[in-house]
Curated annotation (Swiss-Prot):
Location(s), subcellular: Plastid, Chloroplast
Family label: Belongs to the bacterial ribosomal protein bS18 family.
Entry coiled-coil feature ranges: none
Gene Ontology BP, a term: translation
Quaternary data: Part of the 30S ribosomal subunit.
GO molecular function term, any single one: structural constituent of ribosome
Naturally occurring in which organism (per UniProt): Chlorokybus atmophyticus
Pfam name, any one: Ribosomal_S18
Record's keyword annotation contains Electron transport: no
Record-level GO cellular component terms: chloroplast; mitochondrial small ribosomal subunit
Keywords: Chloroplast, Plastid, Ribonucleoprotein, Ribosomal protein, RNA-binding, rRNA-binding
Protein's UniProt name: Small ribosomal subunit protein bS18c
Amino acid sequence: MNLSRRRVSPIKPGETIDYKNIDLLSQFITEQGKILPRRVNGISAKQQRAITKAIKQARFLALLPFLNQDI
């Protein structure tokens, strides 16, 4: 019997996806700085596109690093 559970979205209903919200965006990137795929995040396709766009914008404005140099 396949009991699949609905995942709870890590993005709260009233929370906006914005490039300035670094705490939210850092949940969706790996330690190396790569953007996590949608199947790992458990978010909708629309939210994934918005997260990706916000992460890229934050990287461009130097709010997030392109690569993690701590390795």
